[in-house]
């Protein structure tokens, strides 16, 4: 039975999800720079290209069926078992197809030397899809604590093994080991905590009934995947594996704040918005509050990383990657521009706006791929990233219009309120960048530049938020006070 959604359950589950992603953040904050210092850009690029294909096929294989399970009114085990077997059959076919056609696919992506990686990594597809049903059951039950624990365990073991193998000289195999260890541990953990045991029960009719919703979700997820992963494919094909490796390393690090906040919040918001589907007022309030809070948290991290990209790249990745600091900065900037859109995907999914989500995701995918390709074909990696920033700025306006129109919220009002923390973060970053460029020479140590810039930026941003977001802060304070247990009346125990 799906639990009742209220502020307490949402806050608790967001807390567990954030804890899980924070653990992952800490690991990647340490392991990505270590691996980058040991491995070459070409090795990073080869694995990143192969992983893009695997993730794409795994996403198609799921066909959105498990997302449909999440919003079903009742947990019918015949339907659950049917989805499991459908997922497994599709996963095995996908893995076999990737194994057979690895060479032409790798050549198409501009990385023919990565064909053997595609064959090995094809085994990841059934490992990933095999746990989707167990995970969807935890999401339905709003039980994110158990998932959080196993996420941290799987990521920790994978990261530790990757670093150890890299230090022992295993090179690219250390990255493969990280992927397989994390996938196997997470798969085992999901089945252990969900207590789901597949049975030989299958109903094609039930699978087809779910597909009416799932195909719309799958289409939008494919388009979103293309949006996020097409830059890697374009860069690999037109600029080579070295630039693809630089992009991959920078993108891994720049994506850490998103993974901490967005992955955690989005997983909880999807079922939450789903249960508020027919309550327009609560749904609208939840949309605006969650959007403001995620923007307040994410925007300073993204714009701050843009401002301090040069010393950050040198300190974290070492001198062999120092040339790629503009890529890190522009990637952080491109992600910072989209921070007000952080809650839009789970909102549209949760309220059943699958068609709207699909068409907008498709438009965004085409625009992003075209912009990055335009910058890469006749330019450089930096030019491609500049065009990514431009298309994301246009996306911010368009996406906001789509969502606020679906929510019946005035567009300009919604855009202003949701983007206000982002503007404050941008102003903070401009000041920090100005100080670094004009006074950075007086602090020759990159570590000290990073510390000083972070401290100055934190003070500036805090002041700006206190000045511009007082109503939001008061509301959060009132919510925190309301969650405190009230004292029992004097005669309650008599």
From Swiss-Prot:
Q: In which pathway does it act?
A: Glycan metabolism; exopolysaccharide biosynthesis
**InterPro entries, per database record:** Poly_Biosynth_Transport, Polysacc_synth
GO cellular component terms, A-Z:
plasma membrane
The entry's localization annotation reads:
Cell membrane
Among the GO biological process terms of this entry, one is: polysaccharide biosynthetic process
Question: Per its UniProt entry, which superkingdom is the organism in?
Answer: Bacteria
Q: Which residues form a coiled coil?
A: none
Q: Looking at the Swiss-Prot or TrEMBL record, what is one Pfam family this protein matches?
A: Polysacc_synt
Native species? Rhizobium meliloti (strain 1021) (Ensifer meliloti)
Recite the UniProt keywords alphabetically: Cell membrane, Exopolysaccharide synthesis, Membrane, Plasmid, Transmembrane, Transmembrane helix
Q: Which residues cross the membrane?
A: 16-36, 44-64, 82-102, 105-125, 157-177, 215-235, 253-273, 297-317, 321-341, 343-363, 384-404, 421-441, 447-467
Instruction: Give the protein's recorded name.
Output: Succinoglycan biosynthesis transport protein ExoT
Identify the coding gene.
exoT
Q: Give the UniProt family note.
A: Belongs to the polysaccharide synthase family.
Topological relation to the membrane, as annotated: Multi-pass membrane protein
Key word Secreted present in the record?
no
